[in-house]
Amino acid sequence: MSGTILENLSGRKLSILVSSLMLCQVACFLMGGLYAPVPAGHQTVVGIKCRDVPGRQNDTNFFLYSRGNGACKSLQDMDIEQDPLKMANQLVYVFQMPLPRDNRTLDYSRWQQNLIGVLQVDIAYDSSSELREPPKELQLTIDTRLAYRNKKDADTDWKLYAHSVEQRYLDCHAAHVGLLETLYTCDIIPLFELGALHHNFYLLNLRFPIDTPKRMNLQFGHMHDLTLTAIHQNGGFTQVWLLLKTLLFPFVVGIMIWFWRRVHILQRSPALLEYMLLYLGGALSFLNLPLEYLTLSIEMPYMLLLSDVRQGIFYAMLLSFWLVFAGEHMLIQDTPNKSTIRSRYWKHLSAVVVGCISLFVFDICERGVQLRNPFYSIWTTPLGAKVAMSFIVLAGVSAAIYFLFLCFMVWKVFKDIGDKRTSLPSMSQARRLHYEGLIYRFKFLMLATLLCAGLTVAGFIMGQMAEGHWKWNEDIEIQLTSAFLTGVYGMWNIYIFALIILYAPSHKQWPTMRHSDETTQSNENIVASAASEEIEFSNLPSDSNPSEISSLTSFTRKVAFD
């Protein structure tokens, strides 16, 4: 048995490898901090009030727009206030995106990937009316129409993208109390989400139909102002992100091929940990595959859902690997049989399975439906919000249980190592130094695993944070959010790259010896190596299971049984 590269690699070569990987990690942080802008940008668009054209309310191919030839005439607030019915069923709120800047017409780029719209509603109640304040759960019915056009199209050539009649529930509070009316400001509500930003210009028309028999929009007084916040991924961040993926993808695929070839050279079946390393590398390669380049030429509204699925597969595989990685280094096994996922780890992985299924169901309920209707949101109804929150809480509880259990397993491994180190003084000096070196390397790798796990949890939280926590200061030279995201992404690749290298079978072959000559010959080899400039922590021949890949585990189990 030749052991792993972690056990056989010399101290100098291991230092060079670790230093190189650390430099790559620093480069990933600097790439995001110095060259990438914030991951998401936004633009605030105030709704332009236009008078609807009679007879065209039900024509989904008719659009009112505020800029360009044939633009609608904006209505003044005074005109609306003087109307006894506040121009009910006559108003259309127009949002044309993106807004011009410095008298220049701006357009969206396909590098910006996606577009999310949230709506701020301000409503007013007349002091003379019977209804003077909104109810607790105010239901608002909105006729939403989203259109698009491209640079080469005429100003009037708007095409329908999506149409839907949606209900939203408002939670409002008084902002200004006047003699004639009271103004209420409502919490932001989600309006739409586009998984692909394929066109240059977008147009949104909102109508608030009032229908007495259906009791539609009878309780919200009259609309005062509407403000749309359009959130998009920054094109500069997308370019840096795809550059990082493009650079990392071939390295991970190449190291996987190299690793599997070394495993197949051995005269044994692959161990469970070797299978898990291969699966983990495959999940990372699937995540690294820069499919986003296709969105530059093809409209792919399902890219957000696909990205979530890819990241979910990677998270599930990474979390499962950490449990198996710690479990396979337990020094006293419950059963002497070969480890399998089903026999030893189904209880350990139950929290991972529950959490991943919860997030997957939530994602399908949200973004899966948005492929047909971008205005849909599971958060719009009280029941839907409770169901969505229950899925998120369930996933969060599973994540907390998982992390605590992982820390317990690592602590148990360290405790077992400490207990078994009491047998080291009875060994020869060369053999004791050999195993002390292995224990030191393994502890360092375990601590790196815990650090990676902690940063992964932090990165997941930052990725799920609402982009309402936007950085409004545009003068920050180093964007911590971008640096953290690219740094964590690079850390995943570097960590898995290092694991695949260090746990690959070593090419060093040691001669087969009789048991009586084992200790003498091994000590002579190690002492001879120790006298050289670089000490090789070679694997000592033993009668352990030939499927073992770690001589540290083999040693401690042998000591325990002895």
UniProtKB/Swiss-Prot annotation:
Membrane-protein topology: Multi-pass membrane protein
Gene label: wls
Glycosylation: residue positions: 58, 103
Subcellular localization, as worded in the UniProt entry: Presynaptic cell membrane; Postsynaptic cell membrane; Cell membrane; Endoplasmic reticulum membrane
Keyword Cytoplasm annotated: no
Assembly and oligomerization: Interacts with wg; in the Golgi. Interacts with Vps35, a component of the retromer complex; wls stability is regulated by Vps35.
Record GO biological process: compound eye morphogenesis; cuticle pattern formation; Golgi to plasma membrane protein transport; imaginal disc-derived leg morphogenesis; imaginal disc-derived wing margin morphogenesis; intracellular protein transport; positive regulation of protein secretion; positive regulation of Wnt protein secretion
Coiled coil: none
Cytoplasmic topological segments: 1-13, 261-270, 333-344, 412-441, 504-562
Cellular component GO terms held in the UniProt record: cell projection; early endosome; endoplasmic reticulum membrane; endosome membrane; extracellular exosome; Golgi membrane; multivesicular body; neuromuscular junction
Residue numbers on the Lumenal membrane side: 35-239, 292-311, 366-390, 463-482
Disulfide bond residue pairs: none
TM region(s), chain numbering: 14-34, 240-260, 271-291, 312-332, 345-365, 391-411, 442-462, 483-503
UniProt xrefs under PANTHER family: INTEGRAL MEMBRANE PROTEIN GPR177, PROTEIN WNTLESS HOMOLOG
InterPro entries linked: WLS-like_TM, WLS_GOLD, Wntless
Keywords in alphabetical order: Cell membrane, Cell projection, Developmental protein, Endoplasmic reticulum, Endosome, Glycoprotein, Golgi apparatus, Membrane, Postsynaptic cell membrane, Segmentation polarity protein, Synapse, Transmembrane, Transmembrane helix, Wnt signaling pathway
Domain of life: Eukaryota
A molecular function (GO) term: Wnt-protein binding
Glycoprotein keyword on record: yes
Role summary: A segment polarity gene required for wingless (wg)-dependent patterning processes, acting in both wg-sending cells and wg-target cells. In non-neuronal cells wls directs wg secretion. The wls traffic loop encompasses the Golgi, the cell surface, an endocytic compartment and a retrograde route leading back to the Golgi, and involves clathrin-mediated endocytosis and the retromer complex (a conserved protein complex consisting of Vps35 and Vps26). In neuronal cells (the larval motorneuron NMJ), the wg signal moves across the synapse via the release of wls-containing exosome-like vesicles.
Pfam families per the UniProt record, alphabetical: WLS-like_TM (PF06664), WLS_GOLD (PF21883)
Name of this protein: Protein wntless
Family per similarity comment: Belongs to the wntless family.
